UniProtKB/Swiss-Prot annotation:
A motif (JAMM motif) lies at residues 111-124. Belongs to the peptidase M67A family. Zn(2+) binds at H111, H113, D124. Gene3D superfamilies: Cytidine Deaminase, domain 2. InterPro entries: JAMM/MPN+_dom, JAMM_MPN+_peptidase_M67A, MPN. It comes from Caenorhabditis elegans. GO terms for biological process: proteasome-mediated ubiquitin-dependent protein catabolic process. This is Uncharacterized protein F37A4.5. Keywords: Hydrolase, Metal-binding, Metalloprotease, Protease, Zinc.
Length: 319
């Protein structure tokens, strides 16, 4: 610490210049669908507390890290931070994975920030530095299960910056602690809270990509796959009556809108081709009453017929 303070004091009088020897940051973290689902499920189960786990995968080359699987750690957390990693549990779990033919290595760790974004606290930076002591390319992934929605996952990957290599004064205003020298992927736009907590000085962000293989596609297709006996599950008559009543109310409203559209067409004279185009443009963004009526009536008939047929099949099979 004293050496760092002395070096900073000695560099105060130097002129600010750009440093062009920054390392490349085009490194990409590829997260599989299975690992992403397990991380989100684990993070949601711990709300409002933080949870953590380890990521398994391999370092493909100098610019690619593959995360194939994750497993949870039995760490108790608070709403701000989590405890350190349990080495005994980690060793036992890795030994059990090797017995079943899983030879992946630990490429980093993940933890959740429920509701307050993706960034690293001082405790998280210390935990990440302990992982980097074992492997210099270890990655810390932060996921926010509350702000994540369908089709958009709030997730980011980080790695710490060595404070001995960071010289603050000699850097010009245009210089950065880390420089991106590749157009592969994209970095997420940093939030204000992440910048306040040291993004760019204590740690930096990495590109994150999500990949899906053929086996993972089959797995995801089987998650909500229906079987033949699911069609025999019959809803109660009260539920069917309630749904039909709601559909009849919507049909009455659509009939009024449809009659209004018909009256407007009758009142207007026959327009030329240009006038028809303008009328079609005016209808954009409005409810197509005719199409909605066809959809609701067809679904109403299908539900009624399926309910009657299901009741007949169930009654016949029980006799």
């Amino acid at each position: 610490m004293d050496r760092l303070i002395r070096s900073l004091l000695m560099n105060q009088n130097k002129q600010a210049t750009d440093k062009l020897d920054h390392p490349d940051t085009s490194e990409t973290v590829n997260i599989s669908s299975l690992a992403l689902l397990k991380m989100l499920r684990h993070a949601r189960s711990g709300i409002p507390l933080e949870v953590m786990g380890l990521m398994l995968g391999d370092f493909v080359d100098d610019y690619t890290i593959n995360v194939t699987d994750v497993f949870a750690m039995p760490q108790s957390g608070t709403s701000v931070t989590v405890e350190s990693v349990d080495p005994v549990y980690q060793t036992k779990h890795m030994d059990l994975l090797k017995l079943v033919g899983r030879t992946e290595n630990v490429v980093g760790w993940y933890h959740s920030h429920p509701g307050f974004g993706c960034w690293l606290s001082s405790v998280d930076v210390n935990t990440q530095q302990s992982f980097e002591a074992l492997h210099p390319r270890a990655v810390a992934v932060v996921v926010d299960p509350i702000q994540s929605v369908k089709g958009k996952v709030m997730l980011d990957a980080f790695r710490s910056v060595n404070p001995l290599n960071l010289q603050i004064r000699p850097l010009a205003p245009t210089a950065e602690p880390r420089q991106t020298t590749s157009n592969l992927g994209h970095l997420t736009k940093p939030s204000l809270i992440s910048v306040v907590h040291g993004l760019g000085t204590k740690y930096y962000s990495l590109n994150v990509a999500y990949r899906m293989g053929s086996n993972e596609q089959k797995m995801l297709m089987c998650l909500n796959k229906k079987s033949w006996y699911d069609q025999l599950n019959m809803s109660t008559y009260s539920e069917l009556e309630k749904k039909q009543e709601e559909k009849f109310k919507s049909i009455n409203k659509l009939i009024a809108v449809f009659n209004k559209d018909i009256d407007e067409v009758k009142e207007k004279p026959i327009a030329d081709k240009k006038g028809k185009t303008q009328e079609e443009v005016k209808k954009f963004g409005k409810i197509n009453a005719k199409q909605q009526l066809q959809m609701i009536t067809s679904s109403l008939l299908n539900d009624s017929l399926c309910h009657q047929l299901t009741a007949m099949i169930n009654a016949k099979s029980m006799t």
